[in-house]
């Protein structure tokens, strides 16, 4: 049995889960998410516990068991608390601003970068260099934050670029001058 898959998910008070065949809908104070379970994986709600079971012992079903349990757990956390990713922009003249549903980034390139903010995400910029991404879907929040970071990953010599708050950048020494 999958160690992750056999753990049941405790549902907070304000979260409701509806299982309709292979479709699972999770609703909470922050919003609503739905997920379709693959064939052979079932979910059941008993009281305030959500459990995920599998039909057989095939290698693929064992792999999907823990994965789908984790995805459902992330949905429950998302609709009750939400997910947050914090990014910081380091560099002279590097800045960010939100204009409608577009995140405008100036990262020292010859042109500004306009990243469309996906529906369901709330992006805020403070001090022109601190970007906060909030949402109920963990995958969408992480994907958007990773895309923003990928425009200018932190470089090891001066540390310029877009990084996650708390991310440690291995620094390198520059070239040493000869005699």
From Swiss-Prot:
Keyword 4Fe-4S carried by entry: no
Any Pfam family: Ribosomal_L6
Listed GO biological process terms: cytoplasmic translation
One GO cellular component term noted in the UniProt record for this chain: cytosolic large ribosomal subunit
GO molecular function terms noted in the UniProt entry: rRNA binding; structural constituent of ribosome
TM regions (residue ranges): none
InterPro entries (UniProt xref): Ribosomal_uL6-like, Ribosomal_uL6-like_a/b-dom_sf, Ribosomal_uL6_a/b-dom, Ribosomal_uL6_bac-type, Ribosomal_uL6_CS
Function description: This protein binds to the 23S rRNA, and is important in its secondary structure. It is located near the subunit interface in the base of the L7/L12 stalk, and near the tRNA binding site of the peptidyltransferase center.
Name this protein carries in UniProt: Large ribosomal subunit protein uL6
Species whose genome carries this gene: Akkermansia muciniphila (strain ATCC BAA-835 / DSM 22959 / JCM 33894 / BCRC 81048 / CCUG 64013 / CIP 107961 / Muc)
Gene expressing this chain: rplF
